Amino acid sequence: MAQVDLNCDMGESFGIYQMGTDTQIMPLVSSANIACGFHAGDPSVMRKTLEAAVAQGVALGAHPGLPDLVGFGRRNMQVSAQEAYDMVVYQVGALAGFAKAAGVSLHHVKPHGALYNMAAKDKALADAIARAVRDIDASLVLYGLAGSQLIQAGKNAGLRVASEVFADRTYQADGSLTSRSQPNALLQSDEEAVQQVLTMVTEKRVKAVTGEWVSLDADTICIHGDGAHALSFATKVRAALLQAGVEIKAM
């Protein structure tokens, strides 16, 4: 039976500000990427999200981002490889502390937003992030954009890697995600998301916005927890995968 992980970015509320539909989505996914305070999240949100994931048997992941609360970590910043290493160690270490306090362990690390996209193309940043994950815990799985520098860096560091694809994002001909600054960056209908996911998982390819077919591996599928259609996408994507005989399970 084919198998794929279904992940969601979670714990992105901050103080009195609520983001996402974590409570409803948590039972639908197999792994959760929990914000660690730099782009979103705070200590209480981190703890509560981790506890909710544990209660549902969902694999725990750290979701480190750039220090940009106002921009939600989605704006590029000029950071050195050493700064990227330090940011990842700091944030993963914070969530690992909550995991230890709860008597559980982290399963994976997935960078967030601009840090994720920068590391997909910048070898030095990718290597620094992979090294940070390895130095914290070499058993952690590194999630990265399928076919990206981050996936290769993880392999080079001796880590297990999960090639990630996106249910709600469109793709360019080089396999990169369409920039969020473009009007066609996001898929708007459930039907489009379901069809794209099934094609990526069963055929290992995706159709770019320019019409070309792009080959890719699909170990894990991302649902963005802050997306307008996140709950609907998660519900229908999960149902379609199960109907197609695909088992939903963390790596």
Swiss-Prot record:
One Pfam family recorded for the sequence: LamB_YcsF
KW Ribosomal protein (keyword) present: no
Keywords: ATP-binding, Hydrolase, Nucleotide-binding
Keyword ATP-binding carried by entry: yes
GO biological process: carbohydrate metabolic process
The protein's assembly and partners: Forms a complex composed of PxpA, PxpB and PxpC.
Family statement: Belongs to the LamB/PxpA family.
Reactions catalysed: 5-oxo-L-proline + ATP + 2 H2O = L-glutamate + ADP + phosphate + H(+)
SUPFAM superfamilies: Glycoside hydrolase/deacetylase (SSF88713)
Lineage: Bacteria, Pseudomonadati, Pseudomonadota, Gammaproteobacteria, Aeromonadales
Protein name as annotated: 5-oxoprolinase subunit A
UniProt GO molecular function: 5-oxoprolinase (ATP-hydrolyzing) activity; ATP binding
Function as written in the Swiss-Prot or TrEMBL entry: Catalyzes the cleavage of 5-oxoproline to form L-glutamate coupled to the hydrolysis of ATP to ADP and inorganic phosphate.
EC identifiers of the protein: 3.5.2.9
